[in-house]
Amino acid sequence: MNLINRPRRLRRSDEVRRLCRETRLSSDSLIYPIFVDESLSGVRPIESLPGQNHYGLDSVTQAVEESLSHGITHCVLFGLPKHKDACGSSAWAEDGVIQQAVRTIKAAYPQFHVITDVCMCEYTDHGHCGILCGEEVDNDKTLEVLSRTALSHVAAGADMVAPSDMMDGRIAAIRETFDSHGFAMTPIMAYSAKYASAFYGPFRSAAGSAPSFGDRKGYQMDPHNRREALKECALDVSEGADILMVKPALSYLDVIRECRDAFDLPLCAYSVSGEYAMIKAASAAGLVDEYRVMCETALSIFRAGADMLITYYAKDLADAIKKGDIG
């Protein structure tokens, strides 16, 4: 048989397989989520996220040191405040948990890249992502507090903000606030296509951010929709976003691909808590090889078109990249 084309030629050895990889990964493209609890001293394991921790303000640099030891130089900060109220006033307080954490991290590790999550759900006593009018979130009033919160983060030293609230017009409101207060060069990572997903459960337990009534389907996206994600991304581009995001990742690879093809901005994907917890649970039950599944799922997200990935596996993936198992 005279076979001219033999694809197996490029699969014969590890060296040639690595040479011909189409998808390349780097630890520079990994972002590690860090949970900072204002009421905590030291470190406390997160029950709903095995292998992850809450850090107190006195131990948050430990999280940074651990990240750096694996080659991770980017984090996204989530805060758990002592005080919650109807308007989430702790979110923009000068001595708020995120503001203190940012100052502490940047004082100790000025080159470590700190992204802050901007939302109200961890700070409101009702757990919704904005200011309520009855049982509805008032979009435009919420823009005011989101802008105020984002400004307080960058004033404390944050390198980038990531608004996750899904209010209409929030990118424009924050961009205008930054530009008028001397932060025109501070980038915004927009949670552009954030779906009302069932995969957020472990995070909401870890962050204490579950809504006390109702759900978030009135502002987060319907999982049935794909074209709407392009509309949301286009709006964020027009409002001044610097980076777009799709969240969750694994169940929305088609959306990542669509957004990658449609827009030139860098694209982030968030591999959320439920994705992480599923792998952990399946591994604990002896059903899958955790390491291989971790690597394969991350590859699928980058192969779909993501430029960067927020993941609870960031440190482990960085180690896998160093070993040459992926990347």
Predicted regions mapped to residue ranges:
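Alpha/beta enzyme core
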Residues: S13, S26-I31, E38-G327
